C-alpha cells in the first residue's frame, strides 16, 4: 500500500464507520471493513510518521492513564431550569415572552447520560472534557477518541465547542450487565451510571468496549453565523454527528405540548434513556438578549417526564437494623424495570405505614420511582386479592440478634448494643467523613473484621495489628498498613468529630460542635439543664444524650483515652461584623471548599446550618446553587454570592 492508497483507505473506513455508527445504515460487510482495517494497520506499523489523526486505528483504547487532569471549558456549561407539568411550562413561557414575544422554539430530547464538551481546533478534536462544575471538568480526550460517533476530524476549521450527552443504548446496557453477571462483577444500576463510569475509566480499552454513543445538543464557544438554533444544529449534524431520534420547531405552547406528549408516549421506543424534553428559544439573537440567571439560561428549560409508576408484587417484607437500633421494614418486590432501572425493593417507612395502607405479602401494588429516590409503594390493589395474601405481623424480636425489641409506637428498636447490625453500622458511621474520616473502612472490610471476630466494637479497631489483619482474606501488607495508618491518623481529632462519631441519636454535626464548644470533655458530666441551655439543643436531644452517656460511659472514656481528641480552644469573642450571631446557609460550588468557608464564617460568630427557613439570615450561594437558593428567594432571605460575602467581611 502506498501513501495515497493509505489516505484513501482511511477516508473509506471513516465513511463506513459514519454510515454504520451514525446513520445506522451499513454500506459494507464486516468482512470488507475488517480486511481494509488490517491493511491500514499494517501500513501504519511500518510508516508511523504517516499516521493520520483521524485514522480509525487511533480510536482503539489501549493506554492506561494514571488519572485525569483538569481542563477549563472555553465557555460555561450551564444547567437547565426544570418544569414538571404543563402549568410549569406555561409559567416559563410567560416569563420568556416578557423578554421577547416574537420568538419560536426548538424542542429536542433530554438525554439521560453524561454531559461532554468537545473542542475542535483546525478541524481536529483537541480536547474532550466532562461537565465538571460547569467551568472546569476532567480531560478525558483519549477515552472519548474510542467513541465511534465522535468524529476525530470535521470540515470546520474555526475553533468550536460541541456539547452533547454520552449514552449507552438500552440493548447494549443489557449486554454489558449480562457480561458483568457472568464475570461476577457488580451490575450497573442504570445506563446513565454505566455511561458515566465508562467515560472515566483509566484504561481506555474498557471505554472502547462499552459502545458509547455521543449525541450533540448544542454548542459553546463558536463563530457560527446562523440566525436560528435549529439551523446551527443541522450544521453540526452535517459535520458527521448523530442526529437525535426526534426534534421539532414550535410556535407556541400548544405545539410544544403536543411534541412533548408524543415524545413522552414513545419514550420507551427510543434506543436511549430519556428523562424529558428540552425547549429552547430558536432565535440566536433573542437568546443573547435574554442571557442567564445565576444558575440557568433564561432561553431554555427542561420539561421533565413524569415520575414512572409500575405494578409489581410484594414477595416478602424484611427488616433492616440501623446503628441506633431502629428497625425499618423494606418490601422485596418482583424485579420490575422502571425507566431502565431494575427495582427489587421499596421503602415502607415504618410499621404504621404498613398498617395504614394494609400492605400484605403477595399484594399487587403500584410503586413509584422518582429520580434517584428509593421507590415507594403508593397504592395497594386490593381488588386484585385472591386469598393468597398474608398479613404482616409486627415483629417482637430483632431479626439479627434475636433480642427483644422495644416498641415505641411508630418505631421499633433493638436495644442490644452488641447486635451485629448495630455494631457494623456504628463502625461505618464512626469512620465516615463527617466523623473521623478513616480511609479504608468500607462496608465489606467492616463486615470482614466483624465476622472474623477481630472487631466486636468500635474500641476493638484500635487493637488491630499488622499480624491480625494479615489473617484476613484479601489483606496484604500494604493494604493492612494503610488501614493501620488511617486509624492512627484519627487520633488527635477535633473534639466535635469525636462527639459526632459516637452516633448519638438526634445529635448531629451542628449539635456536636455546640456541645464540644460549651463543655469539651466535660460533656460526659453535663446536667440536663446545662445541656438544654445550649443554643439549638432541645429536651429530646438532651434526653437522648444523657441516656447514651448512661449506657455507654465506659466506652466513651475508653475511646477518649485512645483517640485523645483535642479539647476545643476557647474561641475569642468575635468582633462585630455582619455575620456575628447570624444563621447562614451555604449552597452551590465556590472557589474554596464548603468546609473552609463554613469554618471562616463560624470564626466570625455565624451559625452555619444545613437548611433554609424563615429564621435564616443569609444564604451564600456559588455556581449551580440548588433548591436552597430558590427557597431563600421565595422566603425573602438575603442571598449573597461569594464576592458579596467577602466584601461585607472586609467592610466590617
UniProtKB/Swiss-Prot annotation:
Which keywords label this protein? DNA damage, DNA repair, DNA replication, Ligase, Magnesium, Manganese, Metal-binding, NAD, Zinc
Which Gene Ontology molecular-function terms are recorded?
DNA binding; DNA ligase (NAD+) activity; metal ion binding
**According to its UniProt record, which reaction does this protein catalyse?**
NAD(+) + (deoxyribonucleotide)n-3'-hydroxyl + 5'-phospho-(deoxyribonucleotide)m = (deoxyribonucleotide)n+m + AMP + beta-nicotinamide D-nucleotide
Known cofactor(s): Mg(2+); Mn(2+)
* Pfam families listed in its UniProt record: BRCT, DNA_ligase_aden, DNA_ligase_OB, HHH_2, HHH_5
Known EC number = 6.5.1.2
The record lists Zn(2+) as bound by 398, 401, 414, 419
* Active site annotation, chain numbering: 110
**So where does this one cross the membrane?**
none
Q: What superkingdom heads the lineage?
A: Bacteria
- Residue ranges constituting the BRCT domain according to the UniProt record: 574-652
Q: Where does NAD(+) bind?
A: 30-34, 79-80, 108, 131, 165, 280, 304
Gene Ontology CC: cytosol
The family line of this record is:
Belongs to the NAD-dependent DNA ligase family. LigA subfamily.
Main role? DNA ligase that catalyzes the formation of phosphodiester linkages between 5'-phosphoryl and 3'-hydroxyl groups in double-stranded DNA using NAD as a coenzyme and as the energy source for the reaction. It is essential for DNA replication and repair of damaged DNA.
> Which protein is depicted?
DNA ligase
Taxonomic source organism: Sulfurimonas denitrificans (strain ATCC 33889 / DSM 1251) (Thiomicrospira denitrificans (strain ATCC 33889 / DSM 1251))
